[in-house]
Structure formats: structure tokens, C-alpha cells
């Protein structure tokens, strides 16, 4: 006989509308849990957006049919339901529990592009506006063409905050306020052959979809008694942080840039994008990671450097396989038949997926284990075969850390900060 569920009285999906008056340019505030007896299943919380793309006067810009190589074409950038947001803040009982940098779009893109395969990208992730691209930054890409079109579109995405990426539910009697700050139109729209044409990304509606449930009174009372006795409840989780730094044009190297000063990450990924794309431009996509003639990438931490010797990369002459293997090893995608990210070696070389991966912890791929806390500065150094392009580059760094989030019996959040 199978086991019988006797603990949960009911579960439901609840639509949560904006707390503040809607403004297309934001911010958007939601009260996800308002001191109720319900427990929030944060991992199953979504934001749903309705949007369209027009010119700056609100008129539709037509895309010709059929599309030729000289046609004006435009689309929202990939992973648009995540990319709409520049950054989030999360308050629990009026106390700040989470606030990220202005690179939330990169955080979500790294997670979806690197950690899911083509089948997932072209199925469930299409709800978030993610379509797998064999080559980024070209109007002939199938993924780009799938995103093209006029009219109103609705997309939905989970909220990729640390507390919302772990499976444990949030205690009841918590007032949870989520605030989202959107990106600008130049960042969110990818266009080709557009000349002087300007576009505007218009969000016309946004709401949250929350999963919550109620426990039986007996179990809820026992849980509350245990929290009062032990004074605290803890949520172990993996915290992902995104940092970026600027590299001037006309340089052959990027000296050590210290990105983290509190503790050692589990693993780290980084890629290079043009300054124009990073800051937002209709003619570019912010997710086009190119090698730009890089020859070596060094990570300095805990008095050591990885890799232990220069890689001497030369992408133009097909000398880069070590970096590709290291990326897939860091992700745990090598030598198995159940997971991959559908990024082949040609895509890594020159088609917008030149992302470097490094394991700093021996348990980087096992989320059930924590590493001993090692206080250190983490720095990144790069060398280039040729001068960096005019206008400069941005190096975008995604790092994962062990973290414990705690709530005391009065529901006050206690956060282990990462700087």
C-alpha cells in the first residue's frame, strides 16, 4: 500500500496583483504572503508579463513577409521573461532579505543557457521566451526568428532568487514583499537592418502566480513549538552572485580585478561581451559572448591560481579545447547520458557561447554538501592576443556560494552576506 498524505489540508495557486499603481517603467511591488497561516512554496512562484514592441510613438513596426537578408527584423532578447527585470529586492517583515546587483538578466541567462539541454530550452523554457540558438547575434538564427513577430505576447518565468531556488517552503506568518525593477528598451530588444528606427518595449500587465498550502492544525502547532524551542529555522542553499567589470579598449590584458572579498565560491563562470551590448543597444544582444582574442584566464583565490599553468588559447587557430572541456566538467555534463547544455565545440568557439568555467571547491557539483568556509579575496585576470575592441568590453562573472538563510521565531530574517 502506498503512504497516505495526512499533513496538508489544501494547496492552491493564487494570483497576486500589484500592490502599487502600475507603471510601465516600474518598480513593481508584490505582497506574496501577508501574515497568513499559509506556507509559501517559493520555488513555484512565477511572474507573468504581457508586453508588446512598438516604435516610440506606440505604432506597430511591421516585419516584412517573407524575411530576406536585408529585411528589418526585431525581437525581444532571449529569455525575455527573466531579462525584463534588472534587479529584485525581497523584504520579509519589512526587513531586507535579498537584493542583487543590476545583472539579474545575466544571472538567469547563465542558469538557463548552461544548465539545461536543447529539449528543455525548446519546450518548457519557451514559456519564459527562451529559444535555443545555434548562433547568437545573427538574424538567420532559428531561435531569433522564433521570437520575431508583432502584437501582444505573454510570458512567465520563475523568480531566480536564492531563497526561491531551494525546495523548502517559507514559514507562515511572514509578510513577503517582492519589488522588481525593469530594464530599458535598448537592452530588451534585438534588431537588425533597423537604420534609424527606434523601438519601445511596453509592459502592459504584470502579476505574480504563487503556490501555497495549509498544514493541519496539529502539525502547524508542533512546528511552531519546535521553532520557539530552537529559536531559529535555517534554509541551507546555494547562492549565486553576478559581478562585472569593465576592460578598456586597446588593451592586451585586464589586471587583477577583485570581485569577492568574503569567502571562496564553489564554482565560477565568466564571459566577455561588448560594452555596447552590455549597456543596451537595439543592434546587439547582451548575451553574445565572444572570445575577443583572449589567450589566458586566471582566477586567484586562497593564495593559489587556477588554472595552474597558462592555457595559451588561440581561438582563431582552433586551440581552445581545454577551456571547452573545463566548462563542461564544471557543469558536470561530461561522460554521462542524462544531462547536457547542447553547446557544442563550434558554438563555444565563435557562435556566442564562449563562457569559461572553473571549479574552486571539490564539492562544486554536489549541492548536498557544503565546503568549509575559506575567507579569501577572489580576483580575475585576463590576457589577450590582440587589442580589445574600441569601446571596451565587460567581463560578466557568475559565482556560486554556500549560504544559510535563517528566520528566528519572530520571523526576522538573518542573512549570511556575500561581498
Swiss-Prot record:
<protein>
    <recommendedName>
        <fullName>Uncharacterized protein F54H12.2</fullName>
    </recommendedName>
</protein>
<dbReference type="GO" id="GO:0005829">
    <property type="term" value="C:cytosol"/>
</dbReference>
<dbReference type="InterPro" id="IPR000358">
    <property type="entry name" value="RNR_small_fam"/>
</dbReference>
<dbReference type="GO" id="GO:0004748">
    <property type="term" value="F:ribonucleoside-diphosphate reductase activity, thioredoxin disulfide as acceptor"/>
</dbReference>
<dbReference type="GO" id="GO:0009263">
    <property type="term" value="P:deoxyribonucleotide biosynthetic process"/>
</dbReference>
Amino acid at each position: 500500500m502506498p503512504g497516505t498524505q495526512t499533513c496538508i489540508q489544501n494547496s492552491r495557486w493564487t494570483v497576486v496583483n500589484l500592490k502599487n499603481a502600475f507603471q510601465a517603467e516600474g518598480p513593481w511591488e508584490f505582497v506574496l504572503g501577508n501574515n497568513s497561516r499559509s506556507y509559501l512554496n517559493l520555488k513555484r512562484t512565477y511572474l507573468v508579463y504581457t508586453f508588446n514592441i512598438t516604435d516610440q510613438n506606440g505604432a506597430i513596426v511591421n516585419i516584412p513577409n517573407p524575411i530576406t537578408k536585408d529585411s528589418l527584423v526585431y525581437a525581444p532578447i532571449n529569455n525575455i521573461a527573466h531579462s525584463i527585470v534588472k534587479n529584485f529586492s525581497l523584504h520579509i517583515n519589512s526587513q531586507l532579505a535579498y537584493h542583487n546587483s543590476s545583472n539579474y538578466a545575466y544571472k538567469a541567462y547563465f542558469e538557463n543557457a548552461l544548465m539545461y539541454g536543447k529539449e528543455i530550452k525548446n519546450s518548457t523554457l519557451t514559456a519564459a521566451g527562451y529559444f535555443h540558438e545555434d548562433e547568437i547575434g545573427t538574424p538567420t538564427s532559428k531561435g531569433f526568428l522564433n521570437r520575431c513577430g508583432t502584437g501582444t505576447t505573454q510570458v512567465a518565468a520563475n523568480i531566480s532568487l536564492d531563497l526561491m531556488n531551494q525546495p523548502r517552503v517559507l514559514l507562515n506568518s511572514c509578510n513577503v514583499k517582492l519589488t522588481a525593477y525593469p530594464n530599458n528598451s535598448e537592452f530588451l530588444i534585438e534588431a537588425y537592418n533597423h537604420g534609424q528606427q527606434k523601438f519601445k518595449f511596453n509592459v502592459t500587465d504584470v502579476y505574480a502566480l504563487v503556490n501555497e498550502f495549509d498544514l493541519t492544525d496539529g502539525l502547524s502547532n508542533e512546528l511552531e513549538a519546535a521553532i520557539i524551542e530552537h529559536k531559529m529555522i535555517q534554509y541551507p542553499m546555494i547562492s549565486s552572485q553576478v559581478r562585472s567589470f569593465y576592460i578598456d579598449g586597446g588593451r592586451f590584458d585586464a589586471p587583477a580585478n577583485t570581485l569577492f572579498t568574503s569567502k571562496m565560491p564553489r564554482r565560477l563562470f565568466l564571459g566577455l561581451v561588448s560594452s555596447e551590448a552590455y549597456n543596451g543597444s537595439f543592434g546587439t544582444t547582451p548575451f553574445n559572448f565572444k572570445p575577443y582574442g583572449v589567450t589566458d584566464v586566471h582566477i586567484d583565490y586562497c593564495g593559489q591560481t587556477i588554472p595552474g599553468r597558462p592555457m595559451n588559447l588561440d581561438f582563431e587557430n582552433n586551440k581552445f579545447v581545454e577551456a571547452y572541456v573545463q566548462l563542461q566538467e564544471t557543469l558536470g555534463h561530461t561522460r554521462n547520458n542524462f544531462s547536457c547544455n547542447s553547446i557544442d565545440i563550434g558554438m563555444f568557439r565563435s557562435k556566442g557561447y564562449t563562457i569559461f568555467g572553473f571549479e574552486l571547491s571539490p564539492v562544486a557539483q554536489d549541492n548536498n554538501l557544503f565546503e568549509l568556509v575559506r575567507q579569501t579575496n577572489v580576483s580575475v585576470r585576463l590576457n589577450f592576443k590582440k587589442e580589445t575592441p574600441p569601446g571596451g568590453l565587460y567581463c560578466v562573472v557568475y559565482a556560486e556560494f554556500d549560504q544559510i538563510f535563517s528566520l528566528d521565531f519572530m520571523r526576522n530574517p538573518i542573512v549570511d552576506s556575500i561581498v
